[in-house]
């Protein structure tokens, strides 16, 4: 099993548990250059809010989009957008990535901005 397959296996296991609980998810995906976050409804078919370093408003404020500072900006933006839609409580879906570095920075910023998980 290669690195990507192992990550996807971890992600599938976590998502199955969140589906059983019927939780709204804060999903994170990272690439070497960008980081993406989406708040997905409990039914799994509706994206309630999204933010990423690809967006012009966020990327213009950053020097580089692949570091912890960028993840912090995305975490703050996703929390503000989710709260504006009436979502306070979410389950953090790290998509099989380690809770470290950029993923942890995004989660911390989202918590500081008012999301609860």
Curated annotation (Swiss-Prot):
Protein family: Belongs to the universal ribosomal protein uL18 family.
Subunit structure: Part of the 50S ribosomal subunit; part of the 5S rRNA/L5/L18/L25 subcomplex. Contacts the 5S and 23S rRNAs.
Tree of life domain: Bacteria
Purpose of the protein: This is one of the proteins that bind and probably mediate the attachment of the 5S RNA into the large ribosomal subunit, where it forms part of the central protuberance.
Keyword rRNA processing: no
Keyword Ribosomal protein attached: yes
Alphabetized Pfam families for the sequence: Ribosomal_L18p
InterPro entries noted in UniProt: Ribosomal_uL18_bac-type, Ribosomal_uL18_bac/euk
Coiled coil: none
PANTHER family per the UniProt record, alphabetical: 39S RIBOSOMAL PROTEIN L18, MITOCHONDRIAL, LARGE RIBOSOMAL SUBUNIT PROTEIN UL18M
UniProt keyword list: Ribonucleoprotein, Ribosomal protein, RNA-binding, rRNA-binding
CDD domains: Ribosomal_L18_L5e
GO molecular function: 5S rRNA binding; structural constituent of ribosome
Designated name of the protein: Large ribosomal subunit protein uL18
A GO cellular component entry from the record: cytosolic large ribosomal subunit
GO biological process entries: translation
Gene designation: rplR
């Amino acid at each position: 099993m290669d690195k990507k397959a192992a990550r996807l296996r971890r992600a599938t296991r976590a998502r199955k548990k969140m589906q059983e609980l019927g939780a709204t998810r804060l999903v994170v995906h990272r690439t070497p250059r960008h980081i993406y976050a989406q708040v997905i409804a409990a039914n799994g078919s509706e994206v309630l809010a999204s933010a990423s370093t690809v967006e012009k408003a966020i990327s213009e404020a950053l020097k580089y989009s692949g570091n912890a500072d960028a993840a912090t900006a995305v975490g703050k933006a996703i929390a503000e957008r989710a709260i504006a839609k009436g979502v306070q409580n979410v389950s953090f879906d790290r998509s099989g990535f380690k809770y470290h570095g950029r993923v942890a920075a995004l989660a911390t910023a989202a918590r500081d901005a008012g999301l609860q998980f």
